[in-house]
């Protein structure tokens, strides 16, 4: 049996190693809070601060719903055992046990298998900064059950003090001491074993700016798969430097710019474009998003479905790996945590306008390999923004019923371009100009 076991292990390692950052560049990620996306039985009314019953089998049952929008990767909640009530998964108690609220180990393996059968890659959320809220009773945590595994007790109060950010507690959570060689080696061994054992395709890493950068070099090497790190900060230079230590980071500077542009002025986006060009080591791998579980939903901040649709389509066509937060396709509008973590059951409507637009935009992404096309900004003012990627002209608005004439482009005279989102909407280059008439939704023109 040993030779067979060895062959299987080698095959699994080859499978995992195939998920390179270059391949991830072509993927589009649907973010799931495992406890809130789909359940297999009616567990009653959902208390947003407690477990509500979502599980791995529920996700399996709804993979066609995800696939129908065109997503080919999912990001799920941390899978390890947590303190009771920590439905989100960020409060570790046992590094080596799976969270039983989400299902058994067989259920988790079944999810991975079902996703791969449908060519959906799985990204698992992981935490290496902190453990659950146990004060100083470290005996409740395994294997980090001693005070020597943690930094001395202090709270982060000054986010401009990097030493404090890395060595003190986020929201009172015990802060792991990566300077302890055993702690670092344990975390690195764990992530390597986890990925190999379950055929995980990528990882999302929580709270990276609260951990020394040298640690991420080691963790990245041990993981061996694509990583996206969360540096919750709007400063481009600050966030971009973490991409020197991980494959990718969530593009929070762009996230804030998207809100200020689609709910304000596109001059903000124009400024971001010129300011960001040389900042990220590899902007094509950064994660582009409009919403997530840590912030109020877009429609809570800016209650306009047209603007939201414009922002979402922009995020799918802009450079980077798109990440879309579950429930957005149903126009969820929750406020601050936990109200932005609504259950999705009974709302799997495949007929919403955004569900259909997501499907069409994803089809275009794949047809033209949009990730390989350079971005050229073509027009920007307060209410209109346009860029091209190859033969695609993407036009966006943050208002209603406007007309613009684009003269800075590379399409030849007489070229016909048609909007892939709505049939019959075509324009042609005339006199070197392209006349665009916008409603309240984006227009994605493709050369015919």
Feature locations, PLM:
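Substrate-binding/active-site clefts of carbohydrate-active enzymes
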Residues: 20-28, 33-198, 213-231, 236-238, ...
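Short acidic/histidine-rich active-site segments
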Residues: 325-328
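Hydrophobic h-region of N-terminal signal peptides that target proteins for export
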Residues: 9-17
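Sec-dependent signal peptide recognition
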Residues: 2-9
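Active-site-proximal helices and loops of the catalytic beta/alpha 8
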Residues: 112, 116, 189-289, 303-306, ...
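Second-shell loop/turn segments in exported
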Residues: 177, 300-301
